[in-house]
UniProtKB/Swiss-Prot annotation:
Residues 305-316 have a biased composition (Basic residues). It comes from Mus musculus (Mouse). Residues 360-379, 469-483, 531-540, 604-618, 632-647, 661-682 have a biased composition (Pro residues). Residues 37-49, 112-124, 153-168, 241-252 have a biased composition (Acidic residues). Residues 1-13 have a biased composition (Gly residues). This is RNA-binding protein 33. It comes from the Eukaryota. RNA reader protein, which recognizes and binds specific RNAs, thereby regulating RNA metabolic processes, such as mRNA export, mRNA stability and/or translation. Binds a subset of intronless RNAs containing GC-rich elements, such as NORAD, and promotes their nuclear export by recruiting target RNAs to components of the NXF1-NXT1 RNA export machinery. Specifically recognizes and binds N6-methyladenosine (m6A)-containing mRNAs, promoting their demethylation by ALKBH5. Residues 82-108, 713-728, 736-759 have a biased composition (Polar residues).
């Protein structure tokens, strides 16, 4: 215990100090890791401490009373601890943190006080040791450290008289606090899941052991001290959870309990975890050893100057975390992963930390003055200091570590949460890993940010300890998913941090030592809360800072709403279990301002955050950083999704601003934060873009569907979530990091979003999104329609722009009066201070969008005209052949298509959901797909003409076919969220203009809702129905396709029916006809691949049903739809814009094939290694061939099938097929 506490508490602090001071870099970090691990898992720390710290610290064991006897003159660990406290007092001058900590400890409970004092004693030992180290640099040997401690023992003993008993009690309590059991179990689980808390500890200890083998012995001792420290944490937890105070009687029994329990679950896991952590740290340890030597001196000096306070605090609470930071930045990176792990570990530890949390909260206030050296950390009370010490040697890393210990402190509340949900441990592993990796690759900066993911909450939490109780609601959210634990906890802290004003200031400064520590943590917390994605921001101090602002508003706006935010954030980041990432609650609030950032955190997240997811851990770390991001968020979303969804109606407008889901409640609070953090938001947005870009992966998958559904719930809220989801879901989703940030921006710049240009614009888009977010929030129908229209078709951008101007203007105008006022009102509400800026940004962005749309429209019109001319020629030449061939081919394909339609209709719901997932998986393809399908749509229009000539059925197919493309575009760009948004405005317009649209609307609305499986809101439901229609191919597609449909109408809907080629002319009609077309596009929206068919099926029901038999539609739909799908997959995947361009070729080919039904197939792009035998076998797999001509010089082959149907089938099957590492382009040649 003493050792554990020495590491975690008094001895732990001493260990930390030793680690940080005695063995400046390696040992101190080594011991701090032990201490942090004590923090993370007291039981594990006991085990680890015994293993690592026993050798390392006899002093730690003194903390356990055994080591204290040896190291300290006193027999009691309490003595050492108390001497530590004496040191603390003596050091209080230097480090008010200790005093503050004592105060906080005392404030919380006697047990808490004892524990805190005990830990303080340990920490003070550590602090004292730093002083002693300064005094007794020669004594840096562990014993020297302890002797140094002894030297100040008089002071410590002076205080010791008062608190030794408390320390003893505390040691007993700590030892007895069986919270350690659950904590240890939890820690074990978390450690195992995360990296194995003790393994992480051992790894850290090992890393530091590498730095100091004798420290390993100390570490083992410290492990005991850790037991003490862990027990102290447990005691604190008991303080918070009085259940374990009963065990105060048996220190040894408590220790045995911890040991046995650790052995039962934690010890084994600890060994496993230790291996894992050792592995991770080993990666970092190479530098760790080298840095250990370098850092030993640097850290000695720094710690002597600042490190003592931070060391002790960090030593005790953030000790191991601090050690990690101190030990090595890389180690910190790995440690950070561990810290995240530890966080789960901390969760177990956090019960005590919870106790500490209150103390920390009081100390933070007292602390700030004492720790002027690390003033920024002051806010994050002791942890801040700890990490500042570490940060000083490894400022970036140490800050992350710093947050980690604070989280450890804050974790206490979260420990309760972890208890509630052991799932967090898995989250932690993901996060730590992500963070681990990101720190490794990105370096210290990333490490700090990533560390904050878990640690950040801690730091805010010390101050926010009590506020954390608002956090408890987050605990449920936290509890919902393991990942949420790491993210949610941070969000919790962020919430509290938000409440705590300090984090916001820190948002900016934090990235560096002082401010960096705390603000950065909040920002990291927020970002990392969002999802693993936050780790990406770490490199960018602004990122974390921006997240902080992003989340700061969150914190300000909602301690309680924070939960909602978290809940809703989960809806997006967690709902689609990213991200986080992420896109986590904290980011949500901020997402308001920097939706892109948050969503990206998310979700840029964490899903860049996920968010993933899921990576998550995207982050998302993504988020997997979203992800954090993805796994992290997904768990939360389930529990909170219900809450967020109800809130989403309110948040619909806000959702555009990123994750308003949380913001409905938060918005009132949020509005003020937005004012304060509008500037941060821009930074956050941009940073979050990066942040989420890397992080969104975590939330990626998780977010996509939930977001779609949330989008369905509220076209706008979900778009924000969609942004988050997009981040994880697609490479776009990573861009979606930005896109998540600005789903609206995506919508506004959707054409851009599919391209990568959106990412670059996103920083602007984010601000504009934030500003436009306000506009689009309320004017979601209008702004989003515009953005949707604009963004929905990258290739269709021109048509979409036209239609978007036509339809969007038509719809936006109808909606505009209502929606735009809302835009202004909500932006004002959401961005009271940013209103003017936001409006300016929005206007600028909108103008840019309009310009882009116009340019895209012009390009699209040219393309369409060219395609139309070509197609007209082809149609004229091949009208007869095409009719005959089409009839022949369509009949067989009808059979194929009809089953496909049935399948599509059956799978429309599934595919809608998949569309979210497929969109992410096919996200890039989808995005390109839209481009390709834009061409397809043009081609479809041409085809529609041909088909109209040939058959009415072609029209529906063409329309459906185009809609799949259009919807695919939507899915690709915004996936469904944009679709939903578009659908929403379209639906409104559709309902008004088209009864038919409305008719499918209601049935599909129900169906969509069922598909969504979420009745989110009546309006969201309607929107959802529209969106879902888009997804399920119902009336919703119409709205969804509004922009695309307009394009489609140009190509298929109107064009097919009346304007075969008057796409431009059709635009005006598109507005009226768009509903019809939209329904058809809806079908195409339904799924990227299956959807196109499915949409046909649906449209047959709602729109095309009366008009044309499904069979006919299937026939035509099969050609265009299949081709579109194939091309979309093949070339469409090639690139968003490239796809579009490629698609014209495909479309031309298609037109050719559809019209003449040629038997000759041209295979281009063959690899030089491809033989005629291989080709012939490919050809023969489809049907009998008449001839095969190889043109190696042209890398081309021309084959003639006996049946045109076989040629078409071959083209559809093998176009963009990879043979010998070469993608072949299969074109039908008309003879």
């Amino acid at each position: 215990m003493a050792a554990a506490l020495g590491a975690g508490g008094g001895a732990g602090a001493g260990d930390d100090d030793f680690d940080q001071f005695d063995k400046p870099g390696a040992e101190r970090s080594w011991r701090r890791r032990a201490a942090d691990e004590d923090w993370d898992s007291e039981l594990e720390d006991d085990l680890l401490g015994e293993d690592l710290l026993s050798g390392k610290k006899n002093q730690s064991d003194l903390s356990d009373e055994e080591l204290n006897d040896d190291l300290l003159q006193s027999d009691n660990e309490e003595e050492e601890n108390f001497s530590s406290q004496g040191v603390t007092i003596s050091l209080n001058t230097t480090s008010g943190i200790v005093t503050s900590f004592e105060l906080s400890d005392n404030t919380n409970d006697q047990s808490g006080e004892q524990e805190s004092e005990y830990e303080q004693g340990d920490d003070e030992l550590a602090y004292h040791k730093p002083e002693e180290q300064e005094l007794y640099t020669q004594e840096y040997p562990e014993e020297g450290q302890y002797e140094g401690h002894d030297a100040e023992l008089t002071e410590d003993q002076i205080e010791y008289g008062d608190e030794p008993e408390e320390e003893q009690l505390y040691s007993d309590e700590v030892l007895d606090i069986e919270i350690n059991e659950p904590l240890d179990e939890f820690t074990d689980e978390e450690y195992l899941q995360a990296y194995g808390g003790q393994q992480g500890l051992q790894v850290r200890e090992d890393c530091e052991a590498e730095d100091d083998l004798d420290e390993i012995t100390d570490s083992q001792v410290a492990s005991e001290t850790h037991e003490g420290g862990m027990e102290t944490l447990e005691l604190q937890k008991d303080i918070k959870e009085e259940s374990d105070e009963e065990d105060d009687d048996d220190e040894e029994s408590g220790r045995l309990r911890f040991k046995t329990e650790r052995k039962e679950g934690t010890i084994i896991r600890l060994s496993d975890v230790t291996r894992e952590r050792r592995n991770i740290p080993e990666t970092l340890e190479l530098s760790a050893e080298a840095k250990a030597a370098l850092l030993e001196f640097e850290e000695r000096e720094r710690q002597h100057k600042q490190g003592r306070y931070g060391s002790r605090r960090g030593g005790r609470r953030g000790g191991s975390l601090m050690c990690r930071g101190m030990g090595d930045q890389r180690r910190d990176n790995s440690e950070r992963g561990r810290m995240k792990e530890h966080r789960p570990a901390l969760l177990p530890t956090q019960p005590s930390v919870v106790a500490h949390s209150p103390r920390l909260i009081p100390p933070p206030q007292p602390q700030p003055p004492p720790p002027p050296p690390p003033p920024p950390p002051q806010q994050q009370p002791i942890r801040s200091l700890f990490q500042q010490q570490q940060l000083q040697p490894l400022l970036p890393l140490q800050h992350p570590h710093h947050p980690s210990p604070p989280q450890g402190v804050h974790m206490p509340p979260q420990i309760e949460t972890p208890r509630m949900m052991l799932t967090p441990p898995p989250v932690t592993p993901q996060q730590p890993k992500n963070i681990h990796i990101n720190p490794h690759f990105k370096g210290t900066v990333v490490t700090p940010v990533q560390v904050p993911l878990l640690p950040v909450p801690s730091q805010p939490r010390p101050a926010v300890g009590p506020q954390r109780f608002p956090g408890p609601p987050e605990f449920p959210q936290h509890t919902p998913g393991p990942v949420p634990n790491s993210f949610n906890q941070p969000p919790r802290l962020p919430l509290q941090d938000q409440w705590r004003a300090p984090p916001p200031p820190q948002e900016r400064d934090p990235f560096f030592l002082g401010v960096s520590g705390e603000p950065r943590f909040p920002s990291h917390l927020f970002l990392e809360q969002r999802s693993p994605p936050p780790p990406p921001p770490p490199p960018t101090l602004l990122n974390s800072s921006h997240p902080v602002p992003t989340q700061s508003p969150l914190p300000f706006t909602q301690p309680g709403p924070a939960f909602n935010q978290q809940g809703q954030q989960p809806v997006f980041p967690r709902e689609r279990p990213v991200r986080p990432a992420l896109q986590p609650p904290g980011p949500v609030g901020i997402l308001h301002f920097s939706q892109p950032g948050s969503a990206t955190a998310r979700p840029f997240i964490p899903p860049r955050q996920p968010f993933l997811p899921s990576p998550g851990q995207p982050f998302l770390p993504t988020h997997a950083q979203p992800n954090l991001q993805g796994p992290l968020h997904p768990p939360l979303p389930p529990p909170h999704q219900p809450q967020p969804q109800p809130q989403q109606p309110q948040q619909q407008p806000q959702h555009h601003q990123h994750q308003p889901p949380l913001q409905p409640p938060l918005q009132p609070p949020h509005q003020p934060p937005p004012q304060h953090q509008p500037p941060p938001q821009h930074q956050p947005q941009q940073h979050q873009h990066h942040h989420h870009l890397s992080a969104p992966p975590p939330p990626l998958m998780p977010m996509s569907q939930p977001q779609f559904r949330p989008h369905v719930q509220t076209a706008q809220p979900q778009p924000s979530s969609s942004r988050m989801q997009c981040t994880p879901h697609q490479g776009l989703r990573h861009n979606a990091a930005s896109q998540n940030i600005s789903k609206r921006p995506m919508q506004q710049m959707q054409p851009t979003a599919p391209r990568n240009s959106n990412l670059r614009e996103l920083p602007i888009a984010p601000s504009h999104v934030l500003e436009m977010s306000g506009n689009r929030c309320s004017s979601t129908p209008v702004a989003q329609v515009k953005s949707i229209v604009n963004t929905s078709p990258p290739c269709r951008a021109v048509v979409s722009s036209r239609s978007s101007q036509g339809n969007t203007d038509a719809k936006a105008k109808p909606l505009s009066p209502e929606a735009q006022p809302k835009e202004e009102a909500k932006p004002e509400a959401e961005f009271p201070d940013e209103d003017e800026e936001t409006r300016l940004y929005r206007l600028k962005i909108e103008e840019q969008k309009r310009l882009r749309e116009e340019i895209l429209k012009q390009k699209e019109l040219r393309r369409q005209q060219q395609a139309g001319a070509r197609k007209k020629e082809l149609l004229e030449r091949l009208a007869q052949q095409q009719q005959q061939q089409q009839q022949q081919q369509h009949q067989p394909q009808q059979q194929q298509q009809q089953p496909q339609q049935i399948y599509g209709s059956q799978t429309s719901m599934e595919q809608e959901e998949l569309a979210a997932t497929p969109s992410p998986t096919n996200g890039n393809p989808l995005l390109p797909f839209p481009g390709a399908q834009c061409r397809q749509n043009v081609k479809t229009r041409l085809l529609v003409k041909n088909q109209d000539i040939t058959t009415a059925s072609v029209q529906p197919k063409a329309v459906n076919f185009v809609p799949p493309g259009a919807n695919v575009q939507h899915q690709g760009q915004h996936l469904r969220p944009l679709k939903h948004l578009r659908q929403l405005p379209h639906k409104v317009l559709q309902v008004k203009p088209m009864d038919m649209e409305e008719t499918p609307h209601s049935p599909q609305a129900a169906r969509v809702t069922s598909l969504q499986g979420r009745p989110q809101d009546t309006k969201p439901g309607v929107k959802r129905t529209v969106m879902h229609r888009a997804n399920s191919g119902g009336g919703g597609d119409g709205p969804h396709v509004s922009s695309k449909v307009r394009v489609i109408k140009l190509s298929g809907g109107q064009g097919g029916e009346s304007d075969g080629f008057s796409h431009t002319e059709g635009q005006p009609q598109r507005l009226p006809q768009p509903p019809d077309m939209r329904q058809q596009p809806t079908r195409k929206v339904t799924l990227t691949k299956g959807v196109p068919q499915q949409p046909q099926h649906l449209p047959v029901g709602p729109h095309m049903y009366p008009a044309i038999p499904p069979g006919i539609k299937s026939i035509q739909g099969i050609h265009p739809a299949k081709k579109a799908i194939m091309h979309g997959r093949g070339r469409g995947v090639a690139g968003p814009m490239g796809r579009g361009r490629l698609m014209p070729n495909k479309q031309n080919l298609r037109v050719v094939e559809c019209k003449p039904q040629p038997c000759v197939v041209s295979v281009e792009g063959l690899s030089s290694s491809t033989t005629d035998v291989q080709l012939k076998s490919l050809l023969m797999s489809v049907g009998p061939i008449q001839s095969l001509q190889m043109l190696p010089q042209q890398r081309k082959a021309i084959a003639k099938f006996k049946e045109p149907a076989h040629a078409l089938a071959f083209q559809q099957k093998f176009h963009r097929h990879m043979i010998d590492l070469s993608h072949i382009n299969v074109a039908l040649i008309v003879e």
